Amino acid sequence: MHWLRKVQGLCTLWGTQMSSRTLYINSRQLVSLQWGHQEVPAKFNFASDVLDHWADMEKAGKRLPSPALWWVNGKGKELMWNFRELSENSQQAANILSGACGLQRGDRVAVMLPRVPEWWLVILGCIRAGLIFMPGTIQMKSTDILYRLQMSKAKAIVAGDEVIQEVDTVASECPSLRIKLLVSEKSCDGWLNFKKLLNEASTTHHCVETGSQEASAIYFTSGTSGLPKMAEHSYSSLGLKAKMDAGWTGLQASDIMWTISDTGWILNILGSLLESWTLGACTFVHLLPKFDPLVILKTLSSYPIKSMMGAPIVYRMLLQQDLSSYKFPHLQNCLAGGESLLPETLENWRAQTGLDIREFYGQTETGLTCMVSKTMKIKPGYMGTAASCYDVQVIDDKGNVLPPGTEGDIGIRVKPIRPIGIFSGYVENPDKTAANIRGDFWLLGDRGIKDEDGYFQFMGRADDIINSSGYRIGPSEVENALMKHPAVVETAVISSPDPVRGEVVKAFVILASQFLSHDPEQLTKELQQHVKSVTAPYKYPRKIEFVLNLPKTVTGKIQRTKLRDKEWKMSGKARAQ
């Protein structure tokens, strides 16, 4: 069996010595994880080696058949599958993809579905069949879809009613696209119906023995700078990395976890598939067609959800409601990542619910990189320490590790040996992949500070840093200060050209409704004074522009690049790099 083969490689980890941890991958094999090394099997497949393990435990009566997936649509319809049912259903999905669709190992499959159970089946089906899945949000328009299908040379797309027209508008311009698979109650010309095929498919599928380093997924980066790139992950960088990080959330096998994320974002697979099912826990999913804080609060009150994971904006939106009307009897773990968690969000959530929010940090390319685990002290404004498989450091422009308390670029050590968890590279873009290496480190493109305890503070995207009169100013510092003022609902801070200082801080501000009638000039002065009062005065925004919305990626991240490029273009000047 491939699990008994000699280990193919070692992944060196750097840092303080920690005791050995042993985690079950399945009943046939133990993987010993130590701070000094990791044993990496030659073959690994999350579906057969993790999911089917829990299914076998259920069949053998060694595990209660509790839900693995619990889905609700908010209108009274619910669905529950235990691990045996999930295993069989995903084998049906694999048979559809490799049988009815005729897809071959290594083919690329775009997946654009809302939060429906079929999303999880299709992803698992791809994993079983050795196909490369490429999740995308249903918010994409035809131009976004065309770019992704052409760039990836996808052989198939699995989509729902929400994007049929958008896909059909551009499908003829995608010569590689052969299969269109529709997840819907209705049929559509040119599309195979997934639900119909699922009813006819066999529940037995021979899982492909995939290599640990074999390509498993492609995620298009969010494009906060430039066009989205194709970040390729392997079976080990997703599945095995999840085994190594398992438990940081505090999740137990008997628990229920709700990850509030768009299905096109990597957070969705990390939280709602890899983390929960690695531990044998239940993934809770709400269809949630649109973000509605009242629906989220009602759901938390009505279902035995123990852990909730989402972006900080989820908590900020919930805090705008009257939380005194809701009780969360089961909720214990609140996790936030994807953007900076403002200290006041943490404080307000704790004050109103009695619960802490534990922050985590990562990227499409690296997965979970830093986190505040269940046993760690929470430091407001800090995103935790390095994940167990990574040596994360703050480095200078030559790749030297900087001492604690010094701002620099955040990097993960990838030499002399590349750690598990790092993506394989940008597809067909080796120059861009190589450009992100500085010395022995992979650059995350973020600025930060590491303190004496190993906690990291996020200072901003490296290309977002503002250099004004010799002062280097991180936009998140100014944004955090502005968000403490009741007039500010959302803000984005960029550099703006200045004839004397080179560049100055400019803030784009979305106002709360009750402040829309205020005098703009007076409110500008008030906000500037406010920033001076809560942070170093040199950071205050010398320019403020009130706007109704901010440019964002399809995953909801503010695109400071667009604001900055427009600002500098209007001035007719080029920004110094």
Swiss-Prot record:
Relay the pH-dependence remark from the record: Optimum pH is 8.8.
Q: Where is the signal peptide?
A: none
Q: Which family does it belong to?
A: Belongs to the ATP-dependent AMP-binding enzyme family.
Which protein, by its recorded name, is this? Acyl-coenzyme A synthetase ACSM2B, mitochondrial
Keyword Acyltransferase among record annotations: no
Organism ancestry: Eukaryota, Metazoa, Chordata, Craniata, Vertebrata
**One MF term from GO for this chain?**
benzoate-CoA ligase activity
This protein's GO cellular component annotations are:
mitochondrial matrix; mitochondrion
